[in-house]
Amino acid sequence: MKKVRLKELESRLQQVDGFEKPKLLLEQYPTRPHIAACMLYTIHNTYDDIENKVVADLGCGCGVLSIGTAMLGAGLCVGFDIDEDALEIFNRNAEEFELTNIDMVQCDVCLLSNRMSKSFDTVIMNPPFGTKNNKGTDMAFLKTALEMARTAVYSLHKSSTREHVQKKAAEWKIKIDIIAELRYDLPASYKFHKKKSVDIEVDLIRFSF
């Protein structure tokens, strides 16, 4: 198995460029390097669901999770996002790191599932939390991810929605494991944010069949 230290992975992910002008409507918050590194390190070392696997990253934004996945030896990682500007930055990032096991597709993630059913070993994502104007987006992303994955889906969800997520998983007859509880340091990206940054508690959840 490809050996990468957590600190080393985090410091490499710190070099990934983020959103230049985040779009509120798309709930664009960057996945911080610390969170991305913890998430990918756990998936790689505990479950071996990255190396030589075909991985999808839904709502990939500027590509921090995809790039980390490619660094950890994925056979191929494909990032999906609706936002052309974010994918342009993603493309620059991939070129900067000279990664060849990575690709990106511009599309509406919620319309993907029929075309991509069971096409990926693993799906990873930090979906929109479904607050503000996008209620239920997190669950729509999750439903799509579960249709695309053959083995497992790894996703970040606000800890405050844990019961709701567990209920949905039971309804869909999906196995659910909360594999880490993390503090998501949300930077003040938008004008209406009063504080410099806010800590949100999030669960890293593994969904499997």
From Swiss-Prot:
Q: Which GO terms describe its molecular function?
A: nucleic acid binding; rRNA (adenine-N6-)-methyltransferase activity; S-adenosyl-L-methionine binding
UniProt catalytic activity: adenosine(1832) in 18S rRNA + S-adenosyl-L-methionine = N(6)-methyladenosine(1832) in 18S rRNA + S-adenosyl-L-homocysteine + H(+)
GO BP terms, alphabetized: positive regulation of translation; rRNA methylation; rRNA processing; stem cell differentiation
Expressing tissues: Expressed from very early development (8 post-conceptual weeks) and expression persists through adulthood in multiple substructures of the brain, including the cerebellar cortex, hippocampus, and striatum.
- Short name of one Pfam family: MTS
Query: Entry's InterPro entries?
Result: DNA_methylase_N6_adenine_CS (IPR002052), rRNA_MeTrfase/Polyamine_Synth (IPR051720), SAM-dependent_MTases_sf (IPR029063), Small_mtfrase_dom (IPR007848)
Which disease annotation does the entry carry? Intellectual developmental disorder, autosomal recessive 72: A form of intellectual disability, a disorder characterized by significantly below average general intellectual functioning associated with impairments in adaptive behavior and manifested during the developmental period. MRT72 patients manifest moderate to severe intellectual disability, microcephaly, and dysmorphic facial features.
Chain's role: Catalytic subunit of a heterodimer with TRMT112, which specifically methylates the 6th position of adenine in position 1832 of 18S rRNA. N6-methylation of adenine(1832) in 18S rRNA resides in the decoding center of 18S rRNA and is required for translation and embryonic stem cells (ESCs) pluripotency and differentiation.
| Subunit details | Heterodimer; heterodimerizes with TRMT112.
Name assigned to this protein: rRNA N(6)-adenosine-methyltransferase METTL5
**Source species, please?**
Homo sapiens
